[in-house]
């Protein structure tokens, strides 16, 4: 009961979180309105940036798992998109938020795996190289984008496995959406005009976004879609295919894996296609499985490969790899021959991170640097970074082999796929090293290789007693 001199309201001190929320609610709208009225175009852009920063900060502090889910969708569907209204790469912005959230908030998993140790060693050696060779802002900017894309692997492995598997499924669905869109563009809009509808995300700004492969004097359009570069598309779709088989089941897995494999074939990326083939061969050689499952898998992939080769452009692309007239093979041979000369005097820390040939196709053609991920890591960051990158490959291959010995073929598929990717794609192409979005896709592949290993060895971490990225809830105040 209230005494006669008491009020029906009681003042409760506002905690810091609520004070910050109140300040944002009051200050941000006033400042945004001021910029919109008096700032002109720069002011409007600044206003949009401020709103985005405020919203992103709020989500990161109060609902950080939304960041991981948004990152999964963006990396799968819009890997080269930009934040609307702000010229900032979408996956880099979200990736930075995910990394920061994993530092600020309590994580779901505390243990560190061997795969993460190898990634951390790569980060340390790469940091040494940029400190030794960095001479301009672009060097540190490129290193920063690579760093965020690589740290995502460590941050995602801090998540509870249920949340991490949700991340993987979102990535698969988003990549499948991007694959379907790319197929529509390839079949019905070879000029690539449909991609202009994604202009709010920075797509469609190039005068000519279509990519070709030339064979026998004829030009064939390659599938790229929102991945822009067909080789980057091949890698992104390869990762999605691995996750699709690992995480999905039944008809959904069958339908989306067929879509992803078909789109991967249409990229005409030999590195990605041969990685799948190599991985399946390893799975069939080392995986213990029932005869029925083995027959179904052999029949399914044989039918898929025959269907792919029935397309003349695909058949020509595949078999030209083994001929002496393949221009790509000749260029790779010349680049390997020139590699020691490029590295003379730069073996320890490399030639630098912000070099023109990494960003300008014309300069890349003139320099003709090695299209080999481990050697390109040496070219950019020196022998220490190259050895650390090779250590990531070796540790991943060991984990992959353990997955191959699992009783479940889904684990063997991603284990063999990772080994195949390292043996084929990383030796024939370089986007994993030079393109941040593709670097992040490789980080995701490493993450789910670890997840498959945990399941294959019954070593899944117990995260039920820990809340990931959990912000503290306000303490209830008892009022007498």
Regions picked out by a protein language model, each given a short descriptive name:
Residues 180-190, 287-324, 340-345, 478-479:
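A membrane-periplasm/extracellular boundary helix in multi-pass inner-membrane enzymes
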Residues 67-68, 111-122, 155-201, 408:
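Interfacial loop-to-transmembrane-helix boundary motif in multi-pass membrane proteins
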Residues 414-424, 430-480:
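Transmembrane alpha-helices of multi-pass inner-membrane enzymes
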Residues 127-128, 168-268, 274-285:
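Alpha-helical transmembrane segments of multi-pass inner-membrane proteins
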Residues 38-44, 82-90, 135-145, 228-234, ...:
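Helix-loop-helix junctions and helix-breaking kinks within/between transmembrane helices
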Residues 252-253, 281, 285, 293-294, ...:
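Hydrophobic transmembrane alpha-helices and their immediate junctions
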Residues 58-151, 409, 419-424:
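N-terminal hydrophobic segments of proteins, predominantly signal-anchor/transmembrane helices
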Residues 314-381, 396, 400-406:
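Long extracytoplasmic/lumenal interhelical loops at the membrane interface
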């Amino acid at each position: 009961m209230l005494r006669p001199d008491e009020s029906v309201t009681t003042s409760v001190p506002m905690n810091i979180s609520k004070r910050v929320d109140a300040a944002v609610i009051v200050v941000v709208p006033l400042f945004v309105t001021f910029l919109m009225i008096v700032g002109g175009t720069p002011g409007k852009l600044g206003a949009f940036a401020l709103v985005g920063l405020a919203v992103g900060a709020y989500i990161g502090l109060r609902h950080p798992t939304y960041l991981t889910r948004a990152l999964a969708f963006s990396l799968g569907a819009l890997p080269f998109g930009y934040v609307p209204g702000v010229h900032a790469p979408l996956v880099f912005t979200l990736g930075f938020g995910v990394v920061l959230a994993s530092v600020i908030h309590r994580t779901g998993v505390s243990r560190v795996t061997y795969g993460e140790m190898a990634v951390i060693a790569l980060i340390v050696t790469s940091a040494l190289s940029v400190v030794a060779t960095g001479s301009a802002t672009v060097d540190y900017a490129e290193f920063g984008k690579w760093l965020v894309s690589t740290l995502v692997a460590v941050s995602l492995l801090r998540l509870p496995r249920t949340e991490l598997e949700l991340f993987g499924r979102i990535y698969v669905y988003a990549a499948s959406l991007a694959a379907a869109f790319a197929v529509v563009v390839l079949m019905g809009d070879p000029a690539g005009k449909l991609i202009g509808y994604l202009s709010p995300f920075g797509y469609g700004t190039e005068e000519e976004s279509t990519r070709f492969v030339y064979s026998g004097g004829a030009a064939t359009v390659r599938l790229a879609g929102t991945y822009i570069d067909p080789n980057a598309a091949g890698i992104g779709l390869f990762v999605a295919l691995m996750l699709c088989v690992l995480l999905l089941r039944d008809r959904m897995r069958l339908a989306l894996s067929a879509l992803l494999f078909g789109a991967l074939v249409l990229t005409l990326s030999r590195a990605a296609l041969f990685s799948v083939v190599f991985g399946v061969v390893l799975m069939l050689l080392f995986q213990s499985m029932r005869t029925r499952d083995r027959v179904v898998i052999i029949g399914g992939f044989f039918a898929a490969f025959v269907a792919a080769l029935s397309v003349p452009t695909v058949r020509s692309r595949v078999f030209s790899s083994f001929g002496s007239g393949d221009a790509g093979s000749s260029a790779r041979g010349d680049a390997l021959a020139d590699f020691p000369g490029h590295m003379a005097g730069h073996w320890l820390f490399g030639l630098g991170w912000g070099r023109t040939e990494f960003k300008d196709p014309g300069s890349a053609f003139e320099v003709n640097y090695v299209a080999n991920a481990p050697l390109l890591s040496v070219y950019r960051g020196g022998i220490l970074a190259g050895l650390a990158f090779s250590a990531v490959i070796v540790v991943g291959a060991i984990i992959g082999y353990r997955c191959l010995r699992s009783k479940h073929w889904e684990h063997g598929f991603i284990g063999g796929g990772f080994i195949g990717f390292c043996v084929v794609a990383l030796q024939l192409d370089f986007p994993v090293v030079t393109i941040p979005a593709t670097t992040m896709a490789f980080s995701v592949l490493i993450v789910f290789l670890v997840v498959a290993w945990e399941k294959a060895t019954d070593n899944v971490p117990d995260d039920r007693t820990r809340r990931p990225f959990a912000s503290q809830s306000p303490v209830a105040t008892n009022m007498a």
